[in-house]
């Protein structure tokens, strides 16, 4: 295939990954006909959080990023100067909207279908057949290439080994952080937050402004980086007694008078719309019982290209990364793979890419590896150039962990001050 060949590309999802793919392909392969399928009525993916219709959405009212805007920006598209160093969810959505208007909206080669759900994707002869459904009809369309950009924040990951937990969920005493919106429900209540990732730390801290007591339950309490004085770090939960409102920890300690348990325990990868044979190859046997979801992915070259059919790819599957610039870098790789300018390895251990969580600092190695792949082939005039991870950005990334710890200390002090004033939580004044 050459850059002048007319081909059809489907992008499933209108969040950061889908938008980045549309920008990169429309610039690099202008003869491609691109169709974007967006389940929501607007772009943004998880960052689209209409406050009047927030039920079922991942975001919460007072959320800010855990990565600075200096790292998050797309190639050649900086944030506005007045945006805080750690942008709010609203700042991010406005940034994505501006990105969409600048690079995607009103482009002749790009069609976007809002409020349209992809219900089935299957290989039919030499093309991919997509079945999609909007409010009026069901449609089938054929494409040469497909990029799955549906994200991985739809199926909550919850523990299955805590005795008695089902009754807590049945009585709305336990829920996943996906359903957290703000702290008001916890006023003068005793709450356990399970997990100390970014969301777990942030939610626990926000709760201290109104809750009577906040516990943070994690595997290794001694390693907890939460600096909030109003949060007590405890061991993992062994069992939960709804009748007595008590929780027994793995060290034998019993916590009494518990009102709520919030699980900030992450999400499964889930692709229920992909035909079963392909889904099995990508998700493995799964862990949730419905074969639609899994904690790991398989048979993906460089965490994105389906090795058994390189006309199918997945964008932004890795976690603990800098997603916006990575999405454009991955899309630039996909361009070359789809054009057959960049060969992929199709014979390797299918479990080799099972985990997509990068340990601290390892994401930089991944960016460098992808950039090296791009540099290994001739780049054509007009091709998209993604963010290059130079020394400045590498230093910013390496310092981002301690920078965020310092930010968390400030947020904890802010929450303590609000509690003394008996004021509800809100984000502190922006620092740009």
Curated annotation (Swiss-Prot):
One of its GO terms (cellular component) is cytosol. Keywords: FAD, Flavoprotein, Monooxygenase, NADP, Oxidoreductase. NADP(+) binds at residues 65-66, 199-202. It comes from the Eukaryota. FAD binds at residues 13-17, 46-47, 117-118. Gene3D superfamilies: FAD/NAD(P)-binding domain. Its EC number is 1.14.13.-. This is Thiol-specific monooxygenase. The gene is FMO1.
């Amino acid at each position: 295939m050459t850059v002048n060949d007319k081909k059809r590309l489907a992008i499933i999802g209108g969040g950061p990954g889908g938008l980045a793919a549309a920008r990169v392909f429309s610039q690099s392969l202008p003869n491609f006909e691109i169709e974007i399928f967006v389940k929501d009525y607007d772009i943004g993916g998880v960052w689209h959080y209409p406050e009047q219709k927030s039920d079922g959405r991942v975001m919460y009212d007072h959320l800010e990023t855990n990565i600075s805007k200096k790292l998050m920006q797309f190639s050649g598209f900086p944030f506005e100067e007045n945006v805080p160093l750690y942008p709010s969810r609203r700042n991010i959505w406005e940034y994505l909207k501006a990105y969409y208007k600048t690079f995607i909206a009103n482009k002749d080669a790009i069609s976007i279908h809002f409020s349209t759900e992809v219900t089935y994707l299957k290989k039919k002869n030499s093309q991919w057949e997509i079945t999609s459904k909007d409010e009026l009809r069901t449609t089938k369309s054929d494409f040469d290439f497909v990029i799955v950009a549906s994200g991985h924040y739809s199926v909550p990951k919850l523990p299955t080994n805590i005795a008695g937990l089902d009754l807590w969920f049945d009585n709305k005493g336990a829920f996943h952080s996906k359903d957290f919106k703000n702290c008001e429900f916890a006023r003068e209540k005793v709450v356990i937050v399970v997990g100390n990732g970014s969301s777990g730390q942030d939610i626990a801290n926000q709760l201290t402004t109104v809750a009577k007591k906040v516990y943070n339950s994690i595997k290794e309490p001694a390693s907890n980086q939460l600096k909030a004085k109003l949060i007590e770090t405890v061991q993992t939960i062994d069992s939960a007694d709804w009748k007595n409102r008590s929780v027994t920890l793995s060290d034998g300690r019993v916590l009494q008078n518990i009102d709520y348990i919030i699980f900030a325990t992450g999400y499964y990868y889930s692709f229920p719309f992909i035909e079963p044979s392909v889904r099995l190859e990508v998700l493995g046997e799964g862990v949730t019982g419905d074969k639609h979801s899994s904690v790991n992915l398989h048979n993906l070259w460089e965490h994105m290209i389906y090795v058994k059919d390189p006309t199918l790819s997945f964008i932004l599957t890795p976690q603990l990364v800098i997603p916006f610039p990575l999405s454009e870098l991955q899309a630039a790789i996909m361009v070359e793979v789809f054009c057959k300018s960049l060969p992929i390895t199709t014979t390797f251990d299918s479990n080799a890419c099972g985990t997509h969580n990068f340990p601290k600092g390892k994401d930089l190695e991944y960016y460098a590896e992808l950039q090296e792949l791009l540099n290994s082939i001739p780049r054509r005039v007009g091709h998209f150039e993604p963010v290059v991870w130079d020394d400045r950005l590498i230093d910013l990334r390496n310092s981002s962990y301690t920078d965020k710890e310092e930010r968390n200390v400030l947020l904890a002090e802010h929450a303590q001050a609000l509690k003394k004033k008996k004021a509800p939580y809100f984000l502190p004044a922006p620092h740009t």
